Amino acid sequence: MRLVFAGTPEPALPSLQRLIDSARHDVIAVLTRPDAAAGRRGRPSPSPVAELAAAHGIPVLKPPRPNSEEFVAELAALAPDCCAVVAYGALLREELLAVPALGWVNLHFSVLPAWRGAAPVQAALAAGDEVTGATTFQIELSLDSGPVYGVVTETIRPTDTAGDLLGRLAESGAGLLEATMDGIEDGTLTAVPQPAEGVSIAPKVSVDDARIRWELPAHVVDRRIRSVTPNPGAWTMAGELRIKVGPVTVPDDGPKDLEPGEIRVGKKHVHVGTATDAVLLGTVQPPGKKSMNAADWARGARAEDIRRAR
């Protein structure tokens, strides 16, 4: 099939590469978001998908308004049979959806109808789900609600961060997307409506959402931190410093008398109290510095910065 691939960040790369390598499909163009500021100097930089497409000599489309009449006409002129989407980053309107004869197929990183929205991996981890997955479905106007072509599942491991889990789903989802494209081309695959029950929403995670709430139980603090690692990154105030906090553990032999947010510094360990057990900090990143061992940070910190996290 003649395919246009729409995607932007790194998790979309395995899917694009699978379709490029496929002997059955021809990726005739890539649709991605416009160059965005990156690095300390904030210079505009192409998306990971744009870079991979350019490396393979595939035309790259970066419309600032993908639903504009001008871009709808530009896409129609390419005459794609189908458009595949992985984390493109913009909602598509009716006129654009009508361009390819076989529609638009999205790879979404959850088992729909669970966790529709922008942050399904983060939501699954924060909720304490034991299993998640990836789904291919036909895009409709309403958010992530279209009929489903296929699903793969993935067990969530106790130490998974969002980065870990998304990396595995990006790989397994790439195979699912290729198989879905094959089935659509063959006419052997039929999309099945999503069930009305079990719908949940996963909105985009903001920096404010990533602030650690030490008044929650330890196991909730643990999974909420992992759900925003590496991005946007969990953080807390320690004294007057805003520090990023890496994944924590909940040791059986940790102190039992700490109040939520109270910090206790040992020779080799730093514990912080929660609503239940204390958690053991692994790494922290103070402002303007690289990530470091929490105990090393505490030894060099001011006394007022290591009394309480909030």
Curated annotation (Swiss-Prot):
It catalyses: L-methionyl-tRNA(fMet) + (6R)-10-formyltetrahydrofolate = N-formyl-L-methionyl-tRNA(fMet) + (6S)-5,6,7,8-tetrahydrofolate + H(+). Residues 299-310 have a biased composition (Basic and acidic residues). NCBIfam families: fmt. Belongs to the Fmt family. Pfam families: Formyl_trans_C, Formyl_trans_N. (6S)-5,6,7,8-tetrahydrofolate binds at S110, V111, L112, P113. Its EC number is 2.1.2.9. Keywords: Protein biosynthesis, Transferase. One of its GO terms (molecular function) is methionyl-tRNA formyltransferase activity. HAMAP family: Formyl_trans. It comes from the Bacteria. Attaches a formyl group to the free amino group of methionyl-tRNA(fMet). The formyl group appears to play a dual role in the initiator identity of N-formylmethionyl-tRNA by promoting its recognition by IF2 and preventing the misappropriation of this tRNA by the elongation apparatus. CDD domains: FMT_core_Met-tRNA-FMT_N, Met_tRNA_FMT_C. This is Methionyl-tRNA formyltransferase. GO terms for cellular component: cytosol. Gene3D superfamilies: 3.40.50.12230. Residues 283-310 are annotated as: Disordered. It comes from Mycolicibacterium gilvum (strain PYR-GCK).
